Amino acid sequence: MEGNRPDWASLIDASATAWEWRDNRLYHKEAISEPYHQPSVGRLRRMLLDHVYAAHNASRAVRGALDRLLRELRTDEWAANIGAGVKRLHSRVINVDLHDSEVIDVVTRGQKLPFASNSLALAISQEVLEHLPKPFETIREVHRVLKPGGRFYCQVPFVIGYHHGPHDYWRFTREGIEQLFNPDHWTVQQIGISVGHGTGFYRIAVEFFAVTASAVHRSLYIPTKAAFSILLLPLKFADLLTPFAAERDRSPGGNFCIAVKRT
């Protein structure tokens, strides 16, 4: 580290004037003047969300794909996790997010990234594109910052209900994912199921009971959702059958894609 600058500071585009260093973190100037306030969530509710209801990132398929990509990241290469949340995947992964926290390196606004063109070997996006109003622009920006041959791991939902973060715009089928990647610029290496049809059914069933309860009183939505998140948890075990199902692409909870930058 040079002064208060991290080792990856050399990757930043010198012409990126909308960004400002504060100690060892990089902030978009709009993120400084208009800080993003994440809704407060109790510890118990957060544990239920992360480890029971919305545990997409912990699935065997997701862990296997990401572990392989991170193992192949060389010691002189860098990656970026766009929409990193509260977890650091690897020591050479730069965490990018809307809001600041101890593990975030770049606090951004909009869909622009501060990195120089052709500077990253890997980009990661887990359950993020559905929250962006213009996902095609994000894909183009990721393409810009990746080196030729660089890879993009993109994980998106399909059969799950609305969830603000702070907004929710899109759901993606296998064909929808293919449309995100212009074949003139990308080679789609793999499209897989991140969580299967058991999770898809589970998420919709939990919402069914929670939304129905809210017809009695709005305050019943959250406790009903919490209760049925636990009661219906065995439905997720049907995901074990998804890889063997001939029609597995019809109702998975989500999909992932690994795409390689061509030019």
Question: Which residue ranges define each predicted feature?
Answer:
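GHKL-family ATP-binding catalytic core of two-component histidine kinases
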Residues: 114-116, 133, 173
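Conserved N-terminal segment of class I S-adenosyl-L-methionine
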Residues: 2-118, 122-126, 250-256, 260-263
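Short catalytic micro-motifs in class I SAM-dependent methyltransferases
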Residues: 127-131
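Glycine/Thr-rich phosphate-binding loops of Rossmann-like dinucleotide-binding domains
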Residues: 89-90, 133, 162
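Residue-level recognition of oxygen-bearing side chains
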Residues: 120, 134-137
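S-adenosyl-L-methionine-dependent methyltransferase catalytic module, highlighting the catalytic core
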Residues: 136-137, 141, 147, 151-262
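Residues in and immediately flanking transmembrane alpha helices
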Residues: 94, 110, 122, 143-144, ...
